[in-house]
Swiss-Prot record:
Interacts with outer membrane receptor proteins that carry out high-affinity binding and energy dependent uptake into the periplasmic space of specific substrates. It could act to transduce energy from the cytoplasmic membrane to specific energy-requiring processes in the outer membrane, resulting in the release into the periplasm of ligands bound by these outer membrane proteins. Belongs to the TonB family. PANTHER family: PROTEIN TONB, PROTEIN TONB-RELATED. GO terms for cellular component: plasma membrane protein complex. Gene3D superfamilies: 3.30.1150.10. The chain crosses the membrane at residues 13-29. Residues 145-232 form the TonB C-terminal domain. Signal peptide: none annotated. It is found in: Cell inner membrane. It comes from Campylobacter coli. This is Protein TonB.
Length: 232
């Protein structure tokens, strides 16, 4: 350290540094020497100049606005034309009397229907009033499954005696019987016999045999049927 200070060059550099350091600070903080104005004053001057310029321009260039005349709306409204309302007289509708439909009683239909003629070769239709036994007479020409089964059973059980065939006997026997809902054959008889006794007995026997195949029904029927014996 002593050798560093004892050196002549080093001593001269220290002296110059010591002398010029205060001068440097003096020059640095001196405003008049550098002629430096702060930014705030510059900004204030610019702002004042801008305001003066704006005031001058605004005073010189004021547009003349045309005066507008405002008309107040009048409260008087135009009167609407009054329309005359004509009174419409109501038209009186004529009442038309509708004829009432006369409903005939149920018995009138049964009376007005004409009776159909039936041949002797077809079963006879008779309607009997219900009594204590409540029988109902029917004909086998009706399209009921019950009567079809009875007719089919009679045709299968039809007996044509050999002796009657040999003697060339032919004819028709009208038979009447009652078939109950308990599947019982009652009141079997001949209403109209043929000329030959063989054919009459054969007709009664045919009904007895066929009754074994008669179907059961919920009602009791009174049936009349002709049995025809004819040689082919």
């Amino acid at each position: 350290m002593k050798t560093f200070i004892s050196n002549h060059k080093n001593q001269s550099s220290f002296i110059t540094l010591f002398v010029f350091t205060p001068l440097f600070f003096v020059f640095l903080y001196s405003k008049d020497f550098l002629h430096i104005q702060p930014n705030e004053t510059i900004k204030e001057n610019k702002f004042n100049m801008a305001i003066k310029h704006f005031v001058q321009n605004s005073s010189d260039m004021k547009p003349t606005q045309p005066t507008q005349t405002i008309q107040e709306p009048s409260n008087v409204q135009p009167k609407e034309p009054v329309q005359e309302i004509k009174k419409i007289k109501p038209r009186k509708e004529k009442l038309i009397a509708k004829p009432k439909k006369i409903i005939p009683p149920a018995n009138a239909k049964a009376i007005s229907q004409p009776k159909k003629d039936t041949n002797m070769q077809q079963p006879i239709m008779q309607q009997q009033t219900p009594q204590a036994s409540s029988y109902q007479s029917v004909a086998l020409t009706s399209n009921s499954e019950f009567l079809k089964e009875i007719k089919s059973a009679i045709d299968e059980a039809l007996i044509y005696p050999r002796q009657a065939r040999k003697m060339r006997m032919s004819g028709e026997v009208l038979v009447e019987f009652t078939w109950t809902k308990e599947k019982k054959l009652e009141n079997l008889k001949i209403l109209k016999p043929s000329k030959y006794d063989f054919l009459n007995k054969s007709a009664l026997e045919t009904i007895r045999i066929a009754s074994k195949k008669f179907p059961q029904y919920e009602k009791t029927f009174h049936i009349k049927i002709p049995l025809v014996y004819k040689l082919s």
